[in-house]
Amino acid sequence: MKNKGFTLVELISILTILGIIALITIPIMTKTIKKAEEKALKEQKEVIINAAKKYALDYVSELPIYDGDIYVIEVQELRNSTYLDDENIIDPTTDKPLNGCVNVTYVSSKGNYKYEYTEECNTYAASPVLDKNMLPVVYKNNRWETIGNTKWYDYNNKEWANAVIVKDISKYKKLDAGVEVLDDDIVAHFVWIPRFSYTIQKKNAQGEVTYGYNSTNINNPGSIDIKFTTKSTIDLGSGYYYGNTPSSYRTPDAFYQDVNQDNILDPEEQLSGFWLGKFETGYDQNHECAVSGSFSNCDIEHEEGIYIKSNKSSIRFLGFKNMFETALNLGKNYNLESPTRMMKNAEYGAALYLSQSLFGRCTSKTSCTNIGMNNNSSFITGGGDYKNNLNQSSNGNITGIFDLSGGCWEMTSSFLDGILEKTGFDELPKAIYYDNYTSTDSSKACNNDVCYGHALSETEGWFGTYREFILRESRNGLTRGGDSLDSHTAFASAATGFFENHDSFRIAIAVK
Protein backbone atom coordinates (compact mmCIF):
# COMPACT_ATOMS: atom_id res chain seq x y z
CA MET A 1 0.00 0.00 0.00
CA LYS A 2 1.40 3.38 -1.05
CA ASN A 3 1.85 6.20 1.50
CA LYS A 4 -0.27 9.21 0.53
CA GLY A 5 1.12 12.71 0.91
CA PHE A 6 1.80 15.94 -0.85
CA THR A 7 4.17 16.07 -3.67
CA LEU A 8 6.69 18.88 -3.67
CA VAL A 9 4.73 20.67 -6.36
CA GLU A 10 1.52 20.35 -4.36
CA LEU A 11 3.24 21.56 -1.17
CA ILE A 12 4.63 24.60 -2.94
CA SER A 13 1.20 25.34 -4.36
CA ILE A 14 -0.41 25.12 -0.92
CA LEU A 15 2.20 27.38 0.64
CA THR A 16 1.73 29.85 -2.17
CA ILE A 17 -2.02 29.87 -1.61
CA LEU A 18 -1.53 30.35 2.16
CA GLY A 19 0.85 33.19 1.47
CA ILE A 20 -1.69 34.87 -0.77
CA ILE A 21 -4.36 34.43 1.90
CA ALA A 22 -2.01 35.92 4.50
CA LEU A 23 -1.26 38.88 2.26
CA ILE A 24 -4.98 39.51 2.03
CA THR A 25 -6.06 38.79 5.61
CA ILE A 26 -3.19 40.26 7.67
CA PRO A 27 -3.74 43.85 6.46
CA ILE A 28 -7.46 43.38 7.03
CA MET A 29 -6.81 42.09 10.55
CA THR A 30 -4.29 44.86 11.23
CA LYS A 31 -6.75 47.45 10.01
CA THR A 32 -9.49 45.89 12.13
CA ILE A 33 -7.27 45.92 15.21
CA LYS A 34 -6.24 49.52 14.52
CA LYS A 35 -9.87 50.57 14.15
CA ALA A 36 -10.72 48.82 17.40
CA GLU A 37 -7.86 50.61 19.17
CA GLU A 38 -8.90 53.95 17.70
CA LYS A 39 -12.47 53.35 18.81
CA ALA A 40 -11.30 52.38 22.29
CA LEU A 41 -9.05 55.46 22.44
CA LYS A 42 -11.92 57.69 21.36
CA GLU A 43 -14.13 56.18 24.05
CA GLN A 44 -11.43 56.75 26.66
CA LYS A 45 -11.11 60.38 25.60
CA GLU A 46 -14.88 60.75 25.88
CA VAL A 47 -14.68 59.40 29.42
CA ILE A 48 -12.01 62.00 30.18
CA ILE A 49 -14.09 64.79 28.64
CA ASN A 50 -17.17 63.73 30.62
CA ALA A 51 -15.08 63.76 33.78
CA ALA A 52 -13.83 67.23 32.84
CA LYS A 53 -17.43 68.42 32.43
CA LYS A 54 -18.26 67.21 35.94
CA TYR A 55 -15.11 68.89 37.24
CA ALA A 56 -16.07 72.13 35.48
CA LEU A 57 -19.51 72.10 37.11
CA ASP A 58 -17.85 71.98 40.51
CA TYR A 59 -15.43 74.79 39.59
CA VAL A 60 -17.73 76.90 37.45
CA SER A 61 -16.46 80.14 39.01
CA GLU A 62 -13.05 79.52 37.43
CA LEU A 63 -14.34 78.99 33.89
CA PRO A 64 -13.70 81.69 31.26
CA ILE A 65 -16.47 84.11 30.36
CA TYR A 66 -14.96 85.77 27.31
CA ASP A 67 -15.03 84.42 23.77
CA GLY A 68 -12.03 82.28 22.91
CA ASP A 69 -10.69 82.13 26.46
CA ILE A 70 -9.45 78.68 27.42
CA TYR A 71 -9.43 76.92 30.77
CA VAL A 72 -7.14 73.91 30.96
CA ILE A 73 -7.94 70.85 33.10
CA GLU A 74 -5.14 68.34 33.47
CA VAL A 75 -5.99 64.64 33.30
CA GLN A 76 -3.75 64.12 36.31
CA GLU A 77 -5.85 66.62 38.24
CA LEU A 78 -8.98 64.64 37.31
CA ARG A 79 -7.29 61.55 38.72
CA ASN A 80 -6.09 63.28 41.86
CA SER A 81 -9.56 64.66 42.55
CA THR A 82 -11.20 61.24 41.91
CA TYR A 83 -13.14 62.32 38.82
CA LEU A 84 -11.33 59.53 36.94
CA ASP A 85 -10.54 55.93 37.80
CA ASP A 86 -6.82 55.68 37.08
CA GLU A 87 -6.91 51.94 36.33
CA ASN A 88 -9.56 52.25 33.61
CA ILE A 89 -8.23 55.24 31.70
CA ILE A 90 -5.42 53.89 29.54
CA ASP A 91 -4.12 54.32 26.01
CA PRO A 92 -5.04 51.02 24.28
CA THR A 93 -2.06 51.37 21.93
CA THR A 94 0.45 51.42 24.79
CA ASP A 95 -1.49 50.06 27.78
CA LYS A 96 -0.25 53.07 29.75
CA PRO A 97 -2.39 55.68 31.56
CA LEU A 98 -3.59 58.52 29.34
CA ASN A 99 -2.15 61.91 30.22
CA GLY A 100 -2.74 65.29 28.71
CA CYS A 101 -5.37 67.95 29.24
CA VAL A 102 -8.88 69.00 28.36
CA ASN A 103 -9.15 72.51 26.92
CA VAL A 104 -12.41 74.19 27.89
CA THR A 105 -13.08 77.04 25.44
CA TYR A 106 -15.87 79.57 25.84
CA VAL A 107 -17.91 80.08 22.64
CA SER A 108 -19.89 83.29 23.09
CA SER A 109 -22.01 82.82 19.94
CA LYS A 110 -23.45 79.65 21.47
CA GLY A 111 -23.24 80.69 25.08
CA ASN A 112 -21.52 77.45 26.08
CA TYR A 113 -18.18 75.67 26.30
CA LYS A 114 -16.30 73.44 23.88
CA TYR A 115 -14.34 70.55 25.41
CA GLU A 116 -11.32 69.11 23.60
CA TYR A 117 -8.78 66.54 24.77
CA THR A 118 -5.15 67.33 23.91
CA GLU A 119 -1.82 65.77 24.75
CA GLU A 120 -0.28 69.24 25.19
CA CYS A 121 -0.93 71.08 28.45
CA ASN A 122 1.13 74.24 28.25
CA THR A 123 -0.24 76.10 25.25
CA TYR A 124 -2.52 78.63 26.88
CA ALA A 125 -2.07 81.18 29.63
CA ALA A 126 -4.48 80.95 32.54
CA SER A 127 -7.54 83.15 32.07
CA PRO A 128 -7.33 86.39 34.06
CA VAL A 129 -9.32 86.42 37.29
CA LEU A 130 -11.05 89.77 37.61
CA ASP A 131 -12.36 91.62 40.61
CA LYS A 132 -15.96 92.63 39.90
CA ASN A 133 -14.88 96.29 39.76
CA MET A 134 -12.07 95.69 37.27
CA LEU A 135 -12.85 96.35 33.62
CA PRO A 136 -11.00 94.26 31.00
CA VAL A 137 -9.81 96.35 28.06
CA VAL A 138 -8.08 95.84 24.72
CA TYR A 139 -5.96 98.37 22.84
CA LYS A 140 -7.39 99.06 19.38
CA ASN A 141 -7.71 102.11 17.15
CA ASN A 142 -5.08 103.92 19.26
CA ARG A 143 -7.25 103.74 22.38
CA TRP A 144 -8.37 101.42 25.16
CA GLU A 145 -11.73 99.83 24.35
CA THR A 146 -14.31 97.61 26.03
CA ILE A 147 -14.10 93.97 25.02
CA GLY A 148 -17.71 92.79 25.29
CA ASN A 149 -17.37 89.00 25.09
CA THR A 150 -14.49 89.04 22.59
CA LYS A 151 -10.96 87.69 22.92
CA TRP A 152 -8.78 90.33 24.57
CA TYR A 153 -5.29 88.86 24.98
CA ASP A 154 -2.91 86.39 23.36
CA TYR A 155 0.33 85.75 25.21
CA ASN A 156 1.62 83.60 22.35
CA ASN A 157 1.59 86.81 20.28
CA LYS A 158 2.94 88.96 23.14
CA GLU A 159 -0.46 90.53 23.80
CA TRP A 160 -0.79 90.63 27.59
CA ALA A 161 -4.15 90.97 29.34
CA ASN A 162 -4.96 94.45 30.62
CA ALA A 163 -7.67 95.71 32.95
CA VAL A 164 -8.49 99.14 34.31
CA ILE A 165 -10.26 100.61 37.28
CA VAL A 166 -12.62 103.45 36.38
CA LYS A 167 -14.44 106.03 38.44
CA ASP A 168 -17.85 104.53 37.63
CA ILE A 169 -17.83 100.88 36.53
CA SER A 170 -21.54 100.95 35.67
CA LYS A 171 -20.77 103.32 32.79
CA TYR A 172 -18.87 100.58 30.93
CA LYS A 173 -19.70 97.21 32.45
CA LYS A 174 -22.42 96.01 30.05
CA LEU A 175 -21.28 97.69 26.85
CA ASP A 176 -20.48 95.80 23.66
CA ALA A 177 -16.94 95.57 22.35
CA GLY A 178 -15.31 98.59 20.74
CA VAL A 179 -16.44 101.43 23.02
CA GLU A 180 -13.62 103.77 24.03
CA VAL A 181 -12.77 103.83 27.73
CA LEU A 182 -11.98 107.49 28.28
CA ASP A 183 -8.64 108.25 29.88
CA ASP A 184 -10.26 110.77 32.23
CA ASP A 185 -12.41 107.94 33.63
CA ILE A 186 -9.44 105.64 34.32
CA VAL A 187 -7.72 105.77 37.71
CA ALA A 188 -5.55 102.66 37.44
CA HIS A 189 -4.12 100.24 34.86
CA PHE A 190 -3.21 96.62 35.67
CA VAL A 191 -1.52 93.81 33.72
CA TRP A 192 -2.12 90.08 34.29
CA ILE A 193 0.86 87.80 35.02
CA PRO A 194 -0.45 84.27 34.30
CA ARG A 195 0.84 81.24 36.18
CA PHE A 196 3.85 79.59 34.60
CA SER A 197 6.82 77.38 35.35
CA TYR A 198 10.33 78.23 34.21
CA THR A 199 13.77 76.75 33.70
CA ILE A 200 17.07 78.46 32.81
CA GLN A 201 19.86 76.89 30.75
CA LYS A 202 23.13 76.83 32.74
CA LYS A 203 25.33 75.02 30.23
CA ASN A 204 24.80 74.39 26.53
CA ALA A 205 25.41 71.17 24.60
CA GLN A 206 29.09 72.11 24.28
CA GLY A 207 29.45 72.38 28.05
CA GLU A 208 29.85 76.16 28.03
CA VAL A 209 28.36 78.21 30.87
CA THR A 210 25.29 80.06 29.60
CA TYR A 211 23.05 82.89 30.74
CA GLY A 212 19.64 82.04 29.41
CA TYR A 213 19.33 79.92 26.29
CA ASN A 214 22.61 79.40 24.41
CA SER A 215 24.15 82.74 25.38
CA THR A 216 27.68 82.75 26.79
CA ASN A 217 27.56 86.55 27.17
CA ILE A 218 26.16 87.67 30.52
CA ASN A 219 25.68 91.16 29.06
CA ASN A 220 23.33 89.77 26.42
CA PRO A 221 21.47 86.82 27.99
CA GLY A 222 19.20 84.45 26.08
CA SER A 223 15.63 83.55 26.85
CA ILE A 224 14.23 81.92 29.95
CA ASP A 225 12.21 78.82 29.05
CA ILE A 226 8.61 79.22 30.20
CA LYS A 227 5.52 77.03 30.01
CA PHE A 228 2.11 78.22 31.14
CA THR A 229 0.42 75.91 33.63
CA THR A 230 -2.84 75.42 35.47
CA LYS A 231 -3.33 76.14 39.13
CA SER A 232 -3.14 72.43 39.91
CA THR A 233 0.39 72.11 38.49
CA ILE A 234 3.17 72.59 41.03
CA ASP A 235 6.58 72.02 39.44
CA LEU A 236 9.39 71.51 41.94
CA GLY A 237 12.41 71.08 39.69
CA SER A 238 15.71 72.90 40.13
CA GLY A 239 14.75 75.68 37.72
CA TYR A 240 17.78 75.06 35.52
CA TYR A 241 19.09 72.51 33.03
CA TYR A 242 22.17 71.47 31.05
CA GLY A 243 22.18 70.86 27.31
CA ASN A 244 19.62 72.07 24.79
CA THR A 245 16.50 70.31 26.07
CA PRO A 246 14.61 72.26 28.76
CA SER A 247 13.84 70.26 31.90
CA SER A 248 13.52 70.59 35.69
CA TYR A 249 10.83 73.27 35.53
CA ARG A 250 10.02 75.25 38.66
CA THR A 251 6.87 77.13 39.65
CA PRO A 252 7.88 80.61 40.91
CA ASP A 253 7.14 81.45 44.53
CA ALA A 254 4.95 84.34 43.35
CA PHE A 255 2.11 81.93 42.48
CA TYR A 256 1.87 80.51 46.00
CA GLN A 257 0.41 82.15 49.10
CA ASP A 258 1.19 80.24 52.27
CA VAL A 259 -1.92 81.37 54.11
CA ASN A 260 -1.55 78.65 56.74
CA GLN A 261 2.14 79.44 57.30
CA ASP A 262 2.99 75.74 57.36
CA ASN A 263 5.39 75.64 54.34
CA ILE A 264 3.09 73.09 52.69
CA LEU A 265 2.07 73.71 49.08
CA ASP A 266 -1.67 73.30 49.60
CA PRO A 267 -3.76 73.32 46.38
CA GLU A 268 -6.11 76.00 47.72
CA GLU A 269 -3.12 78.31 48.28
CA GLN A 270 -2.08 78.30 44.61
CA LEU A 271 -2.77 81.24 42.30
CA SER A 272 -3.62 81.07 38.60
CA GLY A 273 -1.92 84.45 38.28
CA PHE A 274 -1.88 87.95 39.73
CA TRP A 275 -2.24 91.56 38.62
CA LEU A 276 0.58 94.11 38.69
CA GLY A 277 0.24 97.85 38.37
CA LYS A 278 1.10 98.82 34.81
CA PHE A 279 3.01 101.82 36.18
CA GLU A 280 4.57 102.91 39.44
CA THR A 281 2.10 104.45 41.86
CA GLY A 282 1.73 108.23 41.50
CA TYR A 283 -0.01 111.55 42.04
CA ASP A 284 -1.01 114.23 39.56
CA GLN A 285 2.06 116.32 38.77
CA ASN A 286 0.36 119.45 40.14
CA HIS A 287 -0.70 117.81 43.41
CA GLU A 288 0.57 119.78 46.40
CA CYS A 289 2.55 116.81 47.69
CA ALA A 290 4.17 116.23 44.30
CA VAL A 291 5.01 119.91 43.93
CA SER A 292 6.53 120.13 47.41
CA GLY A 293 8.55 116.99 46.80
CA SER A 294 7.77 115.87 50.33
CA PHE A 295 5.13 113.17 50.30
CA SER A 296 5.95 112.41 53.92
CA ASN A 297 4.02 115.54 54.93
CA CYS A 298 0.83 114.24 53.32
CA ASP A 299 -1.79 112.00 54.87
CA ILE A 300 -1.29 109.76 51.87
CA GLU A 301 -2.72 106.66 53.54
CA HIS A 302 -6.21 108.13 53.28
CA GLU A 303 -5.57 110.40 50.33
CA GLU A 304 -7.66 110.19 47.20
CA GLY A 305 -6.20 111.00 43.81
CA ILE A 306 -3.63 108.20 43.79
CA TYR A 307 -3.20 106.86 40.28
CA ILE A 308 -1.61 103.97 38.45
CA LYS A 309 -1.30 105.73 35.12
CA SER A 310 1.35 107.24 32.89
CA ASN A 311 2.40 110.88 33.12
CA LYS A 312 2.00 110.96 36.91
CA SER A 313 4.60 111.86 39.53
CA SER A 314 5.88 108.67 41.19
CA ILE A 315 5.20 108.78 44.92
CA ARG A 316 8.52 109.18 46.79
CA PHE A 317 9.88 110.34 50.16
CA LEU A 318 7.26 108.19 51.83
CA GLY A 319 9.06 105.49 53.78
CA PHE A 320 8.24 101.81 53.79
CA LYS A 321 5.50 101.70 56.43
CA ASN A 322 3.46 104.42 54.70
CA MET A 323 3.98 102.76 51.31
CA PHE A 324 2.80 99.44 52.69
CA GLU A 325 -0.31 100.85 54.36
CA THR A 326 -1.15 103.06 51.38
CA ALA A 327 -1.05 100.00 49.12
CA LEU A 328 -3.42 98.11 51.42
CA ASN A 329 -5.88 101.01 51.57
CA LEU A 330 -5.85 101.68 47.85
CA GLY A 331 -8.26 98.82 47.17
CA LYS A 332 -10.85 100.49 49.38
CA ASN A 333 -10.43 103.77 47.51
CA TYR A 334 -10.95 101.84 44.26
CA ASN A 335 -13.99 99.93 45.64
CA LEU A 336 -12.32 96.57 45.02
CA GLU A 337 -13.39 93.42 46.81
CA SER A 338 -9.91 91.92 46.48
CA PRO A 339 -7.14 93.42 48.64
CA THR A 340 -4.48 95.55 47.01
CA ARG A 341 -0.98 95.35 48.43
CA MET A 342 2.59 96.41 47.89
CA MET A 343 4.42 94.33 45.28
CA LYS A 344 6.73 91.63 46.65
CA ASN A 345 10.11 90.89 45.08
CA ALA A 346 8.84 87.43 44.10
CA GLU A 347 6.16 89.11 41.97
CA TYR A 348 8.66 91.48 40.42
CA GLY A 349 10.83 88.48 39.54
CA ALA A 350 7.92 86.64 37.90
CA ALA A 351 7.15 89.65 35.70
CA LEU A 352 10.83 89.93 34.78
CA TYR A 353 11.09 86.22 33.85
CA LEU A 354 8.00 86.48 31.65
CA SER A 355 9.57 89.51 29.98
CA GLN A 356 12.81 87.58 29.33
CA SER A 357 10.98 84.89 27.33
CA LEU A 358 9.36 84.25 23.97
CA PHE A 359 6.17 85.71 25.46
CA GLY A 360 7.96 88.97 26.28
CA ARG A 361 10.94 90.73 24.71
CA CYS A 362 12.61 87.73 23.06
CA THR A 363 12.08 87.37 19.31
CA SER A 364 13.82 83.98 19.42
CA LYS A 365 15.37 81.88 22.17
CA THR A 366 18.75 83.48 21.48
CA SER A 367 17.65 87.04 20.74
CA CYS A 368 16.32 89.11 23.64
CA THR A 369 16.46 92.86 24.20
CA ASN A 370 16.73 94.50 27.58
CA ILE A 371 13.79 96.54 28.87
CA GLY A 372 14.26 100.17 27.89
CA MET A 373 14.91 102.67 30.65
CA ASN A 374 12.49 105.34 31.85
CA ASN A 375 15.05 108.16 32.03
CA ASN A 376 12.63 110.94 32.92
CA SER A 377 14.60 112.95 35.48
CA SER A 378 11.39 114.21 37.09
CA PHE A 379 10.33 110.63 37.93
CA ILE A 380 7.25 110.74 35.69
CA THR A 381 5.55 107.36 35.21
CA GLY A 382 5.70 105.81 31.77
CA GLY A 383 8.42 108.33 30.93
CA GLY A 384 5.60 110.79 30.19
CA ASP A 385 3.43 109.67 27.28
CA TYR A 386 3.96 105.91 27.46
CA LYS A 387 2.48 105.41 24.00
CA ASN A 388 5.68 106.96 22.64
CA ASN A 389 7.92 104.87 24.91
CA LEU A 390 7.05 101.31 23.96
CA ASN A 391 10.69 100.21 24.27
CA GLN A 392 10.22 100.71 28.03
CA SER A 393 7.51 98.03 28.09
CA SER A 394 8.07 94.54 29.48
CA ASN A 395 7.01 92.98 26.17
CA GLY A 396 7.93 95.76 23.76
CA ASN A 397 4.36 96.86 23.10
CA ILE A 398 1.59 98.82 24.75
CA THR A 399 0.08 95.80 26.56
CA GLY A 400 3.14 95.33 28.80
CA ILE A 401 4.32 96.77 32.12
CA PHE A 402 6.24 100.06 32.31
CA ASP A 403 8.76 101.63 34.74
CA LEU A 404 10.50 98.30 35.47
CA SER A 405 13.76 99.91 34.37
CA GLY A 406 14.43 103.46 35.52
CA GLY A 407 11.79 105.80 36.84
CA CYS A 408 12.21 105.20 40.57
CA TRP A 409 13.87 102.41 42.45
CA GLU A 410 10.90 100.23 43.40
CA MET A 411 10.71 99.30 47.05
CA THR A 412 9.43 95.75 47.36
CA SER A 413 7.66 94.20 50.30
CA SER A 414 10.67 92.02 51.07
CA PHE A 415 12.93 91.99 54.13
CA LEU A 416 15.60 90.22 56.07
CA ASP A 417 14.16 87.93 58.75
CA GLY A 418 13.37 89.73 62.00
CA ILE A 419 13.59 93.23 60.54
CA LEU A 420 9.92 93.96 59.91
CA GLU A 421 9.29 94.15 63.66
CA LYS A 422 11.51 97.25 63.73
CA THR A 423 9.70 99.26 61.06
CA GLY A 424 7.04 100.89 63.23
CA PHE A 425 4.07 98.57 62.71
CA ASP A 426 1.78 98.28 65.72
CA GLU A 427 0.94 94.79 64.50
CA LEU A 428 2.84 92.71 61.98
CA PRO A 429 1.15 92.39 58.56
CA LYS A 430 -0.03 89.03 57.29
CA ALA A 431 2.92 86.97 56.14
CA ILE A 432 1.45 86.53 52.64
CA TYR A 433 2.01 90.26 52.09
CA TYR A 434 5.81 90.15 52.19
CA ASP A 435 8.87 88.04 51.36
CA ASN A 436 10.81 87.02 54.45
CA TYR A 437 14.45 86.38 53.51
CA THR A 438 16.44 84.23 55.92
CA SER A 439 19.99 85.01 54.80
CA THR A 440 22.07 87.85 53.36
CA ASP A 441 23.36 85.27 50.84
CA SER A 442 20.86 85.48 47.96
CA SER A 443 21.55 81.86 46.96
CA LYS A 444 20.34 80.71 50.40
CA ALA A 445 17.87 83.45 51.27
CA CYS A 446 14.71 81.33 51.17
CA ASN A 447 15.03 78.90 54.06
CA ASN A 448 18.64 78.05 53.13
CA ASP A 449 17.65 77.50 49.51
CA VAL A 450 17.43 79.41 46.24
CA CYS A 451 14.62 81.96 46.03
CA TYR A 452 12.89 80.50 42.98
CA GLY A 453 11.74 83.08 40.47
CA HIS A 454 12.87 86.10 42.52
CA ALA A 455 15.43 87.25 39.91
CA LEU A 456 18.24 87.20 42.47
CA SER A 457 20.97 84.54 42.32
CA GLU A 458 19.40 82.89 39.25
CA THR A 459 19.92 85.97 37.06
CA GLU A 460 22.79 87.65 38.87
CA GLY A 461 24.73 90.04 36.62
CA TRP A 462 22.45 89.68 33.57
CA PHE A 463 22.78 92.61 31.14
CA GLY A 464 25.81 93.62 33.20
CA THR A 465 23.49 94.90 35.88
CA TYR A 466 24.27 96.13 39.36
CA ARG A 467 23.18 93.81 42.15
CA GLU A 468 23.32 94.28 45.89
CA PHE A 469 21.30 92.08 48.19
CA ILE A 470 20.13 92.72 51.76
CA LEU A 471 23.49 93.29 53.40
CA ARG A 472 23.14 94.78 56.85
CA GLU A 473 20.67 95.94 59.44
CA SER A 474 20.74 99.59 58.40
CA ARG A 475 19.95 98.66 54.79
CA ASN A 476 17.71 95.63 55.03
CA GLY A 477 14.98 96.23 52.46
CA LEU A 478 15.15 95.42 48.75
CA THR A 479 14.53 97.73 45.80
CA ARG A 480 14.52 96.83 42.11
CA GLY A 481 15.05 98.29 38.66
CA GLY A 482 17.18 101.39 39.23
CA ASP A 483 16.02 104.97 38.73
CA SER A 484 16.17 107.59 36.00
CA LEU A 485 19.47 108.97 37.31
CA ASP A 486 21.57 105.86 36.76
CA SER A 487 22.10 103.26 34.05
CA HIS A 488 20.86 100.18 35.88
CA THR A 489 18.59 97.67 34.18
CA ALA A 490 15.36 95.99 35.25
CA PHE A 491 17.48 93.14 36.65
CA ALA A 492 19.21 95.50 39.11
CA SER A 493 18.63 95.13 42.84
CA ALA A 494 19.86 97.15 45.80
CA ALA A 495 19.76 97.00 49.55
CA THR A 496 17.94 99.99 50.96
CA GLY A 497 16.75 101.63 54.13
CA PHE A 498 13.10 102.29 54.78
CA PHE A 499 13.09 105.96 53.81
CA GLU A 500 14.86 106.83 50.56
CA ASN A 501 14.30 109.84 48.28
CA HIS A 502 14.24 107.88 45.04
CA ASP A 503 12.15 104.91 46.15
CA SER A 504 8.58 104.39 44.96
CA PHE A 505 6.34 101.31 44.92
CA ARG A 506 4.03 99.23 42.74
CA ILE A 507 0.65 97.67 43.49
CA ALA A 508 -0.20 93.96 43.20
CA ILE A 509 -3.59 92.21 43.38
CA ALA A 510 -4.26 88.49 43.78
CA VAL A 511 -7.93 87.82 43.00
CA LYS A 512 -9.01 84.44 44.37
Protein language model regions, located:
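N-terminal single-pass transmembrane signal-anchor helix
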Residues: K2-T30
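Aliphatic-rich helix starts adjacent to a transmembrane/signal segment
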Residues: G19, I28-N50
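Alpha-helix exit/C-cap motif
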Residues: N50-D67, N80-D86, Q356-C362, E410, ...
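Extracellular/periplasmic head regions of type IV pilus-like filament subunits
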Residues: V60-S109, G406
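N-terminal module-boundary/linker segments of secreted carbohydrate-active enzymes
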Residues: C121-S248, D262, V511
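Short aromatic-cysteine micro-motif
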Residues: E180, D184-V187, P221-L404
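Short, solvent-exposed loop/turn elements at domain surfaces
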Residues: T199-Q206, Y283-C289, S487-H488
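C-terminal, surface-exposed recognition/capping segments
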Residues: A346-G349, I380-G382, Y386-I398, L404-K512
